[in-house]
Amino acid sequence: MSDMINIRETGYNFTTILKRLEAATSRLEDLVESGHKPLPNMHRPSRDSNSQTHNISFNIGTPTAPTVSTGSPAVASLHDQVAAAISPRNRSLTSTSAVEAVPASISAYDEFCSKYLSKYMELSKKIGGLIAEQSEHVEKAFNLLRQVLSVALKAQKPDMDSPELLEFLKPIQSELLTITNIRDEHRTAPEFNQLSTVMSGISILGWVTVEPTPLSFMSEMKDSSQFYANRVMKEFKGKDDLQIEWVRSYLTLLTELITYVKTHFKTGLTWSTKQDAVPLKTALANLSASKTQAPSSGDSANGGLPPPPPPPPPSNDFWKDSNEPAPADNKGDMGAVFAEINKGEGITSGLRKVDKSEMTHKNPNLRKTGPTPGPKPKIKSSAPSKPAETAPVKPPRIELENTKWFVENQVDNHSIVLDSVELNHSVQIFGCSNCTIIIKGKLNTVSMSNCKRTSVVVDTLVAAFDIAKCSNFGCQVMNHVPMIVIDQCDGGSIYLSKSSLSSEVVTSKSTSLNINVPNEEGDYAERAVPEQIKHKVNEKGELVSEIVRHE
C-alpha cells in the first residue's frame, strides 16, 4: 500500500517537474533562436503516458538544477542540456541576445508621460471639443520628444545649425505649429483662454535646442502659460471644477517636465559619445527605414496602393479667350430700375424721334430686310485700377539703445523675454499685437502704447507702468510696482501679487478694466474699475464728484 502511494506521489511530482522543465526548455530555445545560436541536440521531453515513473529529488536551499535519479536517457539528456543552458557562460550568451535594456532617462520619461500626460489627456477628452482636438497634437508632440531623446542617445552631436538637426526636429515643430493654428483660428471661441494656455506653454518642448541652461527657458515658457491659466481659473471658479482640474493638470505637466529635465538633462540634450555612435543623418535614415518597413509589407499583402483618381473634367471656360470681357449681368440692378420708374415724365427725355423712313408700318420694304443693326457699342479700355494704398508694415524690433529697450511691431510672438534689464533701464512697448512679453528683474519704468491683445509680465519697477491707447491688454505684477497709469484703454486685466496690493492704479478715459486681487486660496478675485462718475455743485458753488457703484 505504501509502495502504491509512493508511486502515485512520485508520478505526480514527475509530471509537475516535467511540465516545468518543458516550459524552461521552450523559453531557452526561444532566447537562443532570437540570437541565431540554437542549442545542439535539444529535444522536448516525451508526453507519452506509458513512460516509466522516475524518482526526481531537489536539494532545497541550493541554487543548483534538479537532479534526476533515473537511468532514462531522455530525461538524463534533458537534465544535462538544461543544466548546460543555465550555466554562467550560456546565461551571458542569452543576455546578449535579449532585447537591449531601456536607458534610465527614457524609462523615467515613460513614467512621467504615463503619470502626468495621461492625466491631462483624460481630462481633455472629458471636456471635448477644441480642447480635446488640441490635446491630441500635444500628445503627439510629447511622443515625438521621446523619439528625439532615444535617437540622441545613439547618434553623434550635430552642429546646432545643421540641416540634419532641423530635419530631426521638424516633426515636433509641425505639431507645435498645429497647436498654435488651432488657437489662432478660434479667437472668438469660448475656449480661447484654454487654447492659449496650452499654446503658450507647449513651446517648452524646445528645450532640446537650448544649451547649456535649458531650465531657465522652460521656466519662462511655463510663466507664459500661467498667465492664461489664471484667467481660466478665475473664469470657472465655483462654476466648473472640471475646467479647474484640467488647467492644473496642464501646469503640473509642465512643472514635472522641468523636474525631469533637471534630473536627466540639466545642461541640455545628451548625445552619444561612444565609439559606435553614428552620425545623425545615418540615425535618421535608419529611423525612416524602420518606419516604412512595416507599412510596405502590409501594402504588398493587400495588392498595393489604389490607383490615383482621374483628373478633373475640363472647365467649360477652357476655350474662352481670356481677353474677352465678361458678359454683363442680365438681372440688372433692381434699385436702378425703380429709380428710372420714379422719374415720371422725365423717363422719356432720353428718347429720340423716329424718322418716317425708319417706320416699318409706313415702309413695307423694311419688314423684309429686318431691323437695321445698330452700331456696336465701343468697349472702353479701362486702365488697370490702382490698388488701394495700405499702411506700410513696419519691421519688428527688439533692441537696447543706451538705457532704453524698444519692443515694437511684434505680431503673434509669445516668446519675448527680457532677462538682462538693469535698475536704470526702461522698456517701451509699441504697436504689438497678440504678444506675450516677460520682463525679469528690477528696472525703472515700462510704457506700453497702441497695442492689441498684448500681455506684459513684470517683476519689480521703481517708478510706474504706463499703459495708453491699448485694447484687451493684460498686466501681471510678480513682485511690486508703485503705480500703474492707464489712459484711453478699452478692455484690460491687471493681476496684482500679494506684495503689490499697495500699488496705486490711476485710470482716465478707459472702459472695461478689471483688477484681480489674490486671495488665500491662491486664486484671484476680480474687482471691476468704476466707469461712471456723478457730479453736482454744492452750496458753496464747488463741484463735487462721486463714483456711481452698481451693487
Swiss-Prot record:
Free-text function comment from the UniProt entry: The N-terminal domain binds to adenylyl cyclase, thereby enabling adenylyl cyclase to be activated by upstream regulatory signals, such as Ras. The C-terminal domain is required for normal cellular morphology and growth control.
Q: Which domain of life is it from?
A: Eukaryota
What are the record keywords, sorted? Phosphoprotein
The record lists the organism as: Schizosaccharomyces pombe (strain 972 / ATCC 24843) (Fission yeast)
**Any one Gene Ontology cellular component term annotated for this protein:** division septum
Q: Where is the composition biased (Polar residues)?
A: 288-300
Acyltransferase listed as a keyword:
no
Q: Which residues form the C-CAP/cofactor C-like domain?
A: 395-529
Q: What is this protein called?
A: Adenylyl cyclase-associated protein
One GO molecular function term of this record is: adenylate cyclase binding
Region of interest: Disordered: 34-55, 288-333, 348-395
A Pfam family per the record: CAP_C
What are the Phosphoserine sites (modified residues) in this protein?
Answer: 92
Which residue intervals are annotated with compositional bias (Basic and acidic residues) in the record?
352-361
Q: What is the lineage of its organism?
A: Eukaryota, Fungi, Dikarya, Ascomycota, Taphrinomycotina
Give me the stretches of Pro residues compositional bias: 305-315
Instruction: Kindly list the positions at which Phosphothreonine occurs in this protein.
Output: 96
Q: Which SMART domains match?
A: CARP
Q: Which GO terms describe its biological process?
A: actin filament organization; adenylate cyclase-activating glucose-activated G protein-coupled receptor signaling pathway; cAMP-mediated signaling; negative regulation of cell growth; negative regulation of conjugation with cellular fusion
Family, as annotated: Belongs to the CAP family.
**TM helices/strands, residue ranges:** none
Check the record and name the InterPro entries matching this protein: Adenylate_cyclase-assoc_CAP (IPR001837), Adenylate_cyclase-assoc_CAP_C (IPR013912), Adenylate_cyclase-assoc_CAP_N (IPR013992), C-CAP_CF_C-like (IPR017901), CAP/MinC_C (IPR016098), CAP_C_sf (IPR036223), CAP_CS_C (IPR028417), CAP_CS_N (IPR018106)
